[in-house]
């Protein structure tokens, strides 16, 4: 008798009314079964070579899927990494590359990076396939979702499906913008919102609070080519001299729970970040034009009063629904 492949439950990403449209015509169509498989894999330490590290080891839901340390050493080698763990949300809108330098074009290819990196999960993909094939539940789930046995290409497809559902769109600010539940912003939050639009929106723009582009925000005056150019930002990918020192703009959403900050986690607090933009900008040939507007002094003037207002508004961008959503939590 011919085996009948189960029908999948197709999923369309929900898009809030204050969010831009999302191009969800993926080569890897979303299904409820694929998303659930991806969630289980995301939290499974079997994905690492020593069976001790999962994706969730560095991407913790309660802090918007980052890890609260500047440079983690939780990977298989216990060596401190060279870049800060980015948060994970609204990735379905990220079409300009992933990682801090855009070195990966999509979530599927991105997953191979940490899986095989000797300092992160240090996994041999052939051995991973063999190990997962020993688990009947995984064998069944992969067969349902992909109609074939477990393959590394389908492992990363499942992870990508789950990560595309990590949507953060329900902060206090969102409810205010959508006129929901009588939510209002107080005077300090409103003042901060105005200041963010005036002083930050050249990069942190739109409903996503990021332009998903690459900028040199004045962290350093020179850019070492040590560690295969990892400190050179986007240049490491494009080899365009105009991209030296440029890193991808992170979203301001959930920023109050995702310390420390920058691609290397150098700033411990939001105050440190604001002080950097006010008085710590390092000039270089590729410094972003928006940081050259201050009468010849690089940076963005931010007074202590303005700093309080900005922080108040940034707190209104914390999405407590997202960081507590059971759909994104460990299924075990």
Walk through the language-model features, giving the residues of each.
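Periplasmic c-type cytochrome electron-transfer domains
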Residues: 1-332
């Amino acid at each position: 008798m011919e085996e009948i492949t189960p029908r999948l439950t197709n999923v369309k990403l929900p898009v809030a009314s204050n969010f831009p449209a999302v191009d969800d015509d993926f080569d890897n169509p979303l299904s409820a079964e694929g998303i659930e498989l991806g969630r289980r894999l995301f939290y499974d330490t079997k994905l690492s070579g020593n069976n001790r590290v999962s994706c969730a080891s560095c991407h913790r839901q309660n802090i918007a899927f980052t890890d609260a340390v500047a440079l983690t050493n939780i990977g298989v080698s216990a060596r401190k990494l060279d870049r800060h763990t980015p948060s994970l949300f609204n990735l379905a809108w990220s079409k300009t590359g992933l990682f801090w330098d855009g070195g990966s074009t999509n979530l599927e290819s991105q997953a191979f990076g940490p899986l095989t990196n000797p300092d992160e999960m240090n996994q041999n993909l052939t051995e991973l396939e063999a190990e997962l094939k020993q688990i009947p539940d995984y064998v069944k789930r992969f067969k349902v979702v992909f109609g074939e046995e477990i393959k590394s290409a389908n492992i990363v497809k499942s992870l990508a499906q789950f990560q595309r559902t990590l949507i953060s769109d329900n902060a206090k600010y969102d409810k205010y913008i959508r006129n929901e539940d009588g939510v209002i912003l107080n005077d300090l939050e409103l003042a901060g919102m105005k200041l963010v639009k005036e002083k930050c929106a050249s990069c942190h723009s739109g409903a996503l609070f990021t332009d998903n582009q690459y900028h040199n925000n004045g962290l350093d005056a020179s850019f070492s080519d040590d560690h295969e150019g990892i400190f050179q930002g986007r240049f490491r990918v494009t080899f365009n001299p105009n991209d030296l020192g440029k890193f991808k703009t992170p979203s301001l959403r959930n920023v109050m729970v995702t310390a420390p900050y920058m691609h290397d986690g150098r700033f411990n607090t939001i105050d440190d970040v604001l002080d950097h933009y006010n008085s710590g900008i390092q000039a270089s040939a590729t410094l972003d034009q928006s940081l050259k507007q201050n009468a010849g002094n690089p940076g963005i003037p931010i007074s202590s009063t303005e700093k309080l207002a900005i922080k108040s508004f940034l707190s209104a961008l914390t999405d407590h629904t997202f960081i507590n959503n059971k759909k994104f939590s460990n299924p075990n």
